[in-house]
């Protein structure tokens, strides 16, 4: 497919060109200061790209520029894709959000919840109920990440060899069985904790469909949508377009760091963070959701299913700050933001720290990639770079503020 291109003048799409120039200048300054290698930003109204800027370099050492067809590791932006894969199976009646996960993955039978202790002295009790598919979709299953360091169960993940998402050398099936052997942090459905749950969903797709996750996504999502640059590895022909990955240094600069092993099909197919993609493909996926399940005559999901995916599912209508299970979730940026089936959802714009319309949904990746859909404004936005920050940064709130300032109708 051709690279993403601008399709309509900003003014004709209800956007202020001068405000968009300020947006570009803001992030170009970060490139000049050595805080970003380069970036791509795209803003679309009504499905047509009204602003597209590619600036800086995708590989600083090699002097290669960011272009419209640059490829990016989108990491956790994989999660909404995995959710769509699950929902296609739900629509076909092959599983339900209410199904116990152990119906398909027996290792999740008889889950146990952490009570106390550390190491070999951990005390657990039987969970009051099963882990259900819907708990995985909403990150309320009680799973975690090993790189967190605020709960004893986090340490148990690290001790089991899964500090990130996978034990070295393991495949998806082996890794998911390992997750199931570890205690839950809390009773399923009672708290929110961002976790490895989408990897479990990826394995669920494999078991229910009888296909490897990469094959299922290629045949059922990427192929029908024309997302030819999205997958779990890059081909020889694509490799030259892949951006270098950087990490943030102590002084706020950047330095190259190892990234996903994308050359050749990976042994571990991560439904949480394994995809590489392009701006064109991300735009296609966002438009599929904005148009409630259909794009260019291809329907992947029913409108009601997309509506279900993109509404808040946290118990009692809570937001992430109220239901979050750890101090990291108790942040002002989580006020007024709920969680759907793989995406965050704005449920109270008056309480969010970044200007967003009611019902705006989307998700981000650890290398500072993000997309969102504001259905009330027929707006989709994406921002791509490749920097893993040491801590929270201002890219996302700055981007939301600057896009909001550009909206004139």
Language-model regions: role of each:
Residues 16, 79, 278:
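Short, conserved phosphate/pyrophosphate- and ester-handling motifs at nucleotide-, phospho-/glycolipid
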């Amino acid at each position: 497919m051709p690279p993403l291109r601008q399709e309509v003048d900003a003014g004709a799409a209800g956007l202020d060109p001068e405000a968009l120039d300020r947006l570009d200048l803001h992030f170009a300054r970060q490139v000049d200061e050595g805080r970003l290698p380069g970036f791509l930003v795209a803003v679309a109204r009504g499905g047509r790209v009204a602003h597209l800027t590619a600036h800086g370099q995708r590989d600083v050492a090699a002097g290669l520029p960011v272009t419209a067809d640059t490829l990016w590791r989108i990491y956790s932006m994989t999660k909404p894709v995995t959710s769509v894969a699950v929902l296609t199976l739900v629509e076909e009646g092959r599983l339900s959000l209410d199904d116990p996960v152990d119906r398909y993955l027996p290792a999740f039978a008889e889950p146990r919840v952490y009570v106390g202790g550390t190491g070999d002295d951990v005390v657990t009790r039987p969970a009051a109920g099963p882990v259900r598919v819907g708990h995985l979709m909403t990150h309320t299953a009680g799973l975690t990440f090993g790189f967190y360091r605020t709960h004893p169960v986090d340490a148990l993940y690290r001790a089991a060899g899964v500090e990130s998402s996978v034990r070295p050398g393991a495949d998806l099936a082996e890794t998911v069985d390992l997750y199931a052997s570890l205690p839950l942090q809390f009773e399923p459905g009672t708290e929110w904790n961002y976790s490895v749950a989408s990897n479990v969903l990826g394995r669920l797709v494999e078991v229910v469909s009888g296909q490897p996750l990469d094959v299922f996504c290629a045949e059922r999502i990427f192929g029908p949508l024309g997302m030819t640059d999205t997958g779990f590895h890059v081909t020889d022909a694509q490799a030259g377009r892949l951006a270098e990955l950087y990490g943030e240094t102590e002084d706020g600069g950047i330095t190259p760091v190892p990234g996903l092993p994308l050359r050749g099909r990976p042994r571990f197919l991560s439904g949480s963070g394994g995809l590489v993609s392009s701006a064109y493909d991300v735009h296609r996926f966002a438009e599929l959701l904005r148009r409630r399940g259909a794009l260019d005559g291809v329907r992947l999901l029913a409108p009601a299913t997309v509506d279900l995916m993109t509404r808040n599912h946290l118990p009692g209508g809570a937001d992430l700050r109220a239901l979050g299970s750890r101090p990291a979730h108790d942040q002002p940026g989580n006020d007024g933001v709920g969680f759907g089936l793989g995406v965050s959802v704005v449920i109270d714009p008056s309480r969010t720290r970044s200007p967003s319309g009611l019902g705006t949904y989307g998700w981000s990746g650890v290398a500072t990639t993000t997309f969102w859909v504001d259905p009330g404004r027929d707006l989709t936005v994406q921002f791509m770079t490749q920097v893993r920050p040491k801590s929270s940064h201002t890219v996302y709130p700055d981007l939301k503020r600057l896009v909001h300032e550009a909206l004139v109708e």
